[in-house]
From Swiss-Prot:
Keywords, sorted A to Z: Ribonucleoprotein, Ribosomal protein, RNA-binding, rRNA-binding
UniProt xrefs under NCBIfam families: rplB_bact
Name the UniProt record assigns to this protein: Large ribosomal subunit protein uL2
GO biological process terms on file: cytoplasmic translation
Organism: Rhodococcus opacus (strain B4)
Pfam families: Ribosomal_L2, Ribosomal_L2_C
Compositionally biased residues, Basic residues: 37-58, 268-278
Name of encoding gene: rplB
Functional note: One of the primary rRNA binding proteins. Required for association of the 30S and 50S subunits to form the 70S ribosome, for tRNA binding and peptide bond formation. It has been suggested to have peptidyltransferase activity; this is somewhat controversial. Makes several contacts with the 16S rRNA in the 70S ribosome.
HAMAP family named among the record's database cross-references: Ribosomal_uL2_B
Region (Disordered): 1-58, 225-278
InterPro entries: NA-bd_OB-fold, Rib_uL2_dom2, Ribosomal_uL2, Ribosomal_uL2_bac/org-type, Ribosomal_uL2_C, Ribosomal_uL2_CS, Ribosomal_uL2_dom3, Ribosomal_uL2_RNA-bd_dom
Compositionally biased intervals (Basic and acidic residues): 253-267
Length: 278
């Protein structure tokens, strides 16, 4: 993938850039692997906003991605097409299996049209192949990794992301995550070889608010610039600080609140945060 920069012919074009989509080999998805996708606009079943700044955007269809691949062990496949997926930053690859079935997978870097792909314990260590962690050599770069055996890929699925297999001991493998976190995962969990393609995605300059609206992202307005009727921080003469600790529009204190997960005990070293990121 390469990035094409626009000339500053208009204020919206100034500084903006776009992917050249050179790796895309087909513009229409496989019909049998597409499902309708209805936008919720950040609302729940009661019609109340539960996630702000969502809504609108271009109409999309959902592509069914095979995140497990455990029922195709030993069945060879070929990459028929590399396609665009509006629902994720990574590209997707359409596989044609020898038994006649078609499936989508996340397209890793280096995968091309016509490339052979396989899954199973005996698969070669090549981009796109899927194996259990116990069969992958230490030091290998992997993506689309499961957290629980048979649970489907959960980690390193976005464009340019990858995980490094640091070692294996007993029934656990040690992984270095994209965030820098080091954690242990069951060696029966499966992973795909290589790093996810389309790594230049993070360097795209969107240029104008309208392109964000096409993606279904709405404006984020600060509470201090609202009226008192709209937000607890609103109102006041001139510029004010809000006059209280940060709260949501509904008066609840702002800040991350997360419960500990059962899998947290498998974390060896936490990801770098705050000043430690540098």
């Amino acid at each position: 993938m390469a990035i094409r920069k626009y000339k500053p012919t208009t204020p919206g074009r100034r500084g903006s850039s776009v992917s050249d989509f050179a790796e895309i080999t087909r513009s229409t998805p496989e019909k049998s692997l597409v499902r309708p996708l209805h936008g919720r606009g950040g609302r729940n079943a009661h019609g109340r906003i539960t996630t702000r700044h969502k809504g609108g955007g271009h109409k999309r269809a959902y592509r069914l991605i095979d995140f497990r691949r455990n029922d195709k062990d030993g069945v060879p496949a070929k990459v028929a097409h590399i396609e665009y997926d509006p629902n994720r930053t990574a590209r997707i690859a359409l596989l044609h299996y020898a038994d006649g079935e078609k499936r989508y997978i996340i397209a890793p870097k280096g995968l091309f049209q016509g490339a052979p792909v396989e899954s199973g314990a005996g698969a070669d260590i090549k981009p796109g192949n899927n194996l259990p962690l116990r069969n992958i050599p230490t030091g290998t770069t992997i993506h689309a990794v499961e957290l629980r055996p048979g649970g489907g890929a959960k980690m390193a699925r976005s464009a340019g992301s990858s995980i490094q297999l640091l070692g294996k001991e007993g029934t656990y493998a040690t992984l270095r995550m994209p965030s820098g976190e080091i954690r242990r995962v069951d060696v029966r969990c499966r992973a795909s070889i290589g790093e996810v393609g389309n790594a230049e995605q993070s360097n795209i300059n969107w240029g104008k608010a309208g392109r964000m609206r096409w993606k279904g992202k709405r404006p984020t307005v600060r509470g201090v610039v609202m009226n008192p009727v709209d937000h607890p921080h609103g109102g006041g003469e001139g510029k004010t600080s809000g006059g209280r600790h940060p709260v949501s529009p509904w008066g609840k204190p702002e800040g991350r609140t997360r419960k500990n997960k059962a899998s947290d005990k498998l974390i060896v070293r936490r990801r770098r945060t705050g000043k430690n990121k540098r």
